[in-house]
């Protein structure tokens, strides 16, 4: 018997290790009592309805008059009704559930031998946050849409938490923090920076329903990270077809040039254009729903501002290198004539960063006790970079930059960082009776970070840099 118990404990711990940071739902709890005696009502029926989608949840009060419904859909509004034979029905509407939190809603019931009707209470004050599990900040979709944001990123939104600074929380290293999307971990597995994969933003802001920022939570579902984390859930379809189309644009004219009395001078030309749409609705009313989002953004990138000099004299203020045009031409012609290798232009460094995001989600109310959500998203980001600018001579201890007033490069030395992220999650929330609930969550994430050379370089040649003599 002890051996079986030990094996069961090991299996349970193993399952818990796989289930890391799985916060995708909300919960509802409360107590039902009589209004005149404050006596607990045993066996009262609780029914909660997510009004936009018609999703229904049910529970029965226990011997202490308490009820709990786990695995509920985040958001609302919800309408909650309590009924018991011989008593007036009680109803509360307008309840909003927040991610990872438990909403507390109590009811008092009065006897009614005739049971003529029901009493409706609307707009009741929220009793939310009675079941906090650590310092947390919940950010609704309405707040996200009204919040000014520069780069439309998760970390930009997370600053509503007083602990957050990018992916750093309470002064901790951002690489020790955690980010989940519908329960899937989407962290920078390479660990070189604290930025999220997919160019720092693996999902469109218009596809997110709610964000929760947590710091040192003691919820056992949120583990395997130090300090803080961001949990986000995506939008779902409802019984109403809804869609949006949007375009965002910004350039250097939307940036200031002065700080106090200091003039920073003219800003270089830059701009970002973003196109996208969302669309969702019912496949089968009250039963099956879909939601889709696509977004594409492009931004011209200035990889190298430096130009070769006409007379061999450097002008750092105007980004003129002391490497003469004649030397650049000699090297280029030599490579073409003798090796049939074109290193590219030294006057033009064309580069355009772009980012594509796709997301699709299906929600299925299998029964009132079983609800399934399946989500897939894909992000591809392309960002251009110049050749590594640092250079060090071990013998002379001379340090300089390859792209500076001392050196120049050809466009063929550029390379792009091609980041792609594919993620899928399947989340089944089930309730078995009044006291048992279960979440079965399957997630898979594939992150690929490639380095690709410029279009003008397709062989194994090393990036070529021309540096003038000292």
Describe the residue ranges of each PLM region:
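Extracellular loop and loop/strand-boundary signature of outer-membrane beta-barrel proteins
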Residues: 196-197, 261-265, 344-348, 409-414, ...
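Periplasm-facing N-terminal accessory domains of Gram-negative outer-membrane beta-barrel systems
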Residues: 20-122, 126
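Outer-envelope beta-barrel architecture signal
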Residues: 154, 175-177, 237-241, 286-290, ...
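Residue-level signature of outer-membrane beta-barrel architecture
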Residues: 215, 234, 281-283, 364-366, ...
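Periplasmic N-terminal accessory/gating domains of Gram-negative outer-membrane beta-barrel systems
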Residues: 62, 88, 93-106, 117-236, ...
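Transmembrane beta-barrel strands of outer-membrane/channel proteins
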Residues: 123, 245-251, 292-296, 374-378, ...
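Outer-membrane beta-barrel translocator/receptor signature
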Residues: 193, 206-212, 220-229, 235-328, ...
């Amino acid at each position: 018997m002890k051996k079986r118990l030990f094996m069961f404990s090991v299996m349970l711990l193993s399952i818990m290790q796989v289930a890391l940071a799985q916060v995708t739902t909300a919960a509802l709890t409360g107590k039902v009592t009589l209004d005149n005696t404050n006596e607990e009502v045993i066996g009262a029926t609780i029914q909660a309805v997510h009004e936009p989608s018609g999703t229904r949840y049910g529970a029965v009060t226990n011997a202490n008059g308490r009820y709990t419904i786990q695995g509920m859909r985040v958001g609302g509004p919800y309408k909650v009704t309590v009924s018991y034979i011989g008593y007036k029905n009680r109803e509360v509407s307008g309840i909003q559930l927040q991610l990872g939190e438990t909403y507390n809603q109590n009811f008092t019931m009065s006897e009614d031998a005739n049971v003529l009707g029901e009493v409706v209470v609307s707009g009741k004050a929220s009793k939310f946050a009675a079941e906090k599990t650590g310092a947390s900040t919940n950010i609704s979709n309405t707040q996200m849409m009204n919040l000014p944001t520069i780069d439309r990123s998760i970390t930009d939104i997370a600053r509503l938490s007083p602990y957050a600074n990018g992916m750093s929380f309470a002064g901790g290293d951002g690489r020790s923090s955690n980010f989940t999307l519908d329960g899937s971990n989407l962290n920078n597995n390479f660990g070189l920076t604290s930025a999220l994969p997919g160019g720092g933003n693996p999902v469109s802001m218009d596809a997110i329903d709610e964000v929760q920022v947590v710091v040192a939570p003691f919820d056992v579902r949120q583990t395997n990270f130090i300090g803080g984390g961001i949990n986000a859930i995506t939008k779902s379809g409802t019984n109403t077809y809804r869609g949006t189309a949007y375009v965002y644009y910004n350039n250097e004219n939307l940036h200031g040039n002065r700080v106090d009395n200091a003039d920073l001078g003219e800003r270089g030309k830059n701009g970002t254009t973003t196109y996208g749409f969302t669309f969702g609705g019912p496949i089968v009313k009250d039963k099956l729903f879909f939601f889709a989002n696509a977004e594409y953004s492009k931004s011209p990138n200035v990889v190298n501002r430096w130009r070769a000099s006409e007379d061999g004299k450097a002008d750092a203020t105007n980004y003129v290198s002391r490497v003469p045009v004649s030397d650049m031409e000699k090297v280029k012609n030599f490579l073409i004539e003798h090796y049939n290798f074109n290193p590219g232009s030294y006057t033009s460094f064309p580069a355009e960063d772009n980012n594509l995001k796709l997301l699709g989600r299906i929600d299925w109310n299998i029964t009132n006790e079983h609800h399934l959500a399946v989500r897939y998203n894909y992000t591809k980001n392309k960002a251009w970079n110049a050749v590594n600018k640092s250079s060090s001579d071990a013998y002379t201890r001379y340090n300089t930059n390859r792209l500076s007033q001392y050196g120049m490069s050809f466009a063929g030395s550029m390379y792009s960082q091609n980041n792609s992220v594919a993620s899928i999650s399947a989340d089944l929330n089930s309730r078995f009776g009044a006291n048992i609930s279960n979440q079965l969550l399957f997630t898979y994430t594939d992150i690929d970070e490639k380095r690709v050379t410029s279009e003008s370089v397709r062989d194994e040649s090393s990036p070529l840099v021309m540096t003038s003599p000292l």
